[in-house]
Amino acid sequence: MSYAIFKHGGKQYKVVEGDIVLLDKMNKEPKALVELVEVLAVSKEGKLSCGKPFVNGAKIEVEVINEGRAKKVITFKKRRRKDSKTKRGFRRDFTRVRITKIVA
């Protein structure tokens, strides 16, 4: 089983071909093909190649499925005896992609 570890938006993801992953918003149209080149490690046929920091010549080809927004996350802070409270909401924008090919 071959897999790859790549970096996108300050996070690292471990994927195999055919996986569906939620990445940070990329502003691409659905069915667009995108290449991700910040590949940290690739394992093919049991051989692991790690980069310093990235693997030379490695890339991951992905197909954009859609874009959307996640459910709202509420943060609530209350300071006791101070009659003070704060309520905030945050919705993450994401791009759903399918891993089509891992090139190493």
UniProtKB/Swiss-Prot annotation:
Family: Belongs to the bacterial ribosomal protein bL21 family.
Listed name of the protein: Large ribosomal subunit protein bL21
Subunit field text: Part of the 50S ribosomal subunit. Contacts protein L20.
Function: This protein binds to 23S rRNA in the presence of protein L20.
Biological process terms in GO annotation: translation
SUPFAM superfamilies: L21p-like
Taxonomic classification: Bacteria, Pseudomonadati, Campylobacterota, Epsilonproteobacteria, Campylobacterales
HAMAP family given in the database record: Ribosomal_bL21 (MF_01363)
Entry GO terms, CC: cytoplasm; ribonucleoprotein complex; ribosome
Keywords carried by this UniProt record: Ribonucleoprotein, Ribosomal protein, RNA-binding, rRNA-binding
Gene: rplU
Single annotated GO MF: structural constituent of ribosome
